[in-house]
């Protein structure tokens, strides 16, 4: 889940 500030790439 990308909150904007924290970028978590889901692959």
UniProtKB/Swiss-Prot annotation:
Modification type Valine amide: residues: 11
A Pfam family recorded for this sequence: Periviscerokin
Subcellular location(s) per record: Secreted
Biological process, per Gene Ontology: neuropeptide signaling pathway
GO cellular component, one term: extracellular region
Keywords: Amidation, Neuropeptide, Secreted
Main location: secreted
InterPro entries in the record: Periviscerokinin
Family: Belongs to the periviscerokinin family.
Function: Mediates visceral muscle contractile activity (myotropic activity).
Record-given protein name: Periviscerokinin-1
Source taxonomy: Eukaryota, Metazoa, Ecdysozoa, Arthropoda, Hexapoda
């Amino acid at each position: 889940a990308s909150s904007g500030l924290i970028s978590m790439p889901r692959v």
